[in-house]
Amino acid sequence: AEKAGLPKGALQYIPVPSMDATKALMDHPGIATILATGGPGMVKSAYSSGKPALGVGAGNAPAYIEASANIKQAVNDLVLSKSFDNGMICASEQGVIIDSSIYDDVKKEFEAQGAYFVKQKDMKKFESTVINLEKQSVNPRIVGQSPKQIAEWAGITIPDNTTILIAELKGVGEKYPLSREKLSPV
């Protein structure tokens, strides 16, 4: 990482993972915010740390774009992650949380990089195409499909150069089915 230009110590890892090592990392005074993905024990530990924490289950990882981020780079990384193999990899970001102070700039950059924001009038039909609402899980039909194919199934017309599809949500959980894992370029 340092050879690629990152500052010394910017990228670190725990060579032998354990809950004790993870707890020590979360308790470290140099850690301001925790992003926890994995089993319920990991998420509960993060929420109990006394620090701001974002917790998700296995395979439903969010990304957070903080106010000081390099917006162009952050958006590029997310578009690459979600468009590689049409987002089939469970480690690809399933959602993005954006600091409100840079929201408009991030949205413009996503659009500049080919992202299509699903219009509010199309949201219900898009949601029911992407998520099996009865089972509250991804519709297997859309897994690994192109943005063009998913939009076509939803009855939405998108530009030919669309890289990913974005649905703006105001929350997460059962009331927001699109906040679930999607395994697609959504």
What is each model feature region?
Residues 11, 34, 99, 150, ...:
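Residue-level signal for inorganic ion chemistry
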Residues 43-173:
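ALDH superfamily catalytic-core signature
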Residues 1-73:
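Rossmann-like NAD(P) dinucleotide-binding subdomain of oxidoreductase/dehydrogenase enzymes
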Residues 179-186:
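Conserved glycine-rich beta-strand-loop-beta hairpin in the small C-terminal domain of fold type I
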